[in-house]
Amino acid sequence: TRCAYCSFVSQSVERTLGLVEPYLEVLHREITDAARMVQEAGLHIKSFYMGGGTPTTLSADQMDRLLTHLNRSFDLSGCAEYCIEAGRPDTIDREKLQVLLDHGVDRISVNPQSLEDHVLTAIGRRHTARDVEEAMALATGMGFPHVNMDLIAGLPEDTPEGFRRTLDKCLSYGADNITVHTLSLKKGSRILLENFTIPSAEAVGEMLDYANAALRQADFRPYYLYRQKYMSGSFENTGWCISGAEGLYNIYIMEELHSILSLGAGGSTKMVDPVHQRIERVFHTKYPTEYIQRSEKLEENLSAFRQFHENMRG
């Protein structure tokens, strides 16, 4: 499902179940080709991040096959961080989390956005606050070194009091990263298309002020910040963590000193030449059907990535 605030490319696994295996087959081939290119270009992987969407909509077997192929294809010996978005708690179970641990994943994200059940219903989430609590107990109990939780200030039907309850619960669950987003009124989202009623800028400001005070009181510190277009109240998104739990991938994105090679439908590859302060991007086709059918686009993007880095070396 796609949440009411989201305008990202997404496909319902339930409605497109027949595409999953063909999609994974093409993704496996792209991983093979990308790993060969990275090795031949003499590049090294510092951080791995699998996002979406919600990768944990895959079955445990599908995830196991995907990560097995990934780990065999790429040299991850110098990779300091292995992160996967577990995302919605209704996609998380012990079997899937064990697969992630078995393959060396050391950072996951469980993203409730809110822990007020009426807010979750308003934004189209299928899970409850209780589901989040159970997913977090499972993740922390199984020993994941780092767990992030995403929250959004300014969601429909939310209030400063409800946001406070949500944040206090997140702090009690043992997450060492909490990312506080401000609602972005994105074109194409249901919130805009269907004229949802959202909290005022003043109310959102109260939510963020509370987050700032409560997180600092809990020994969290902000380590990255960014703004998006159309944000409620012109506020920002802030990543908070306890000391030593910083997410490297987030830092690399903000610094814009590292290239990011993206694989899969909807991916955006960023090529960075820090010496000459030059950045170029190439984009994958957006939808799974296009991704499966247009193998030449995958080849073009990998070729562009290789050429960019060859040119950097002169």
Model regions: which residues?
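Flexible glycine/acidic-rich beta-alpha junction loops that bind and position SAM and/or redox cofactors
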Residues: A4, H118, A122-I123, A153-P160, ...
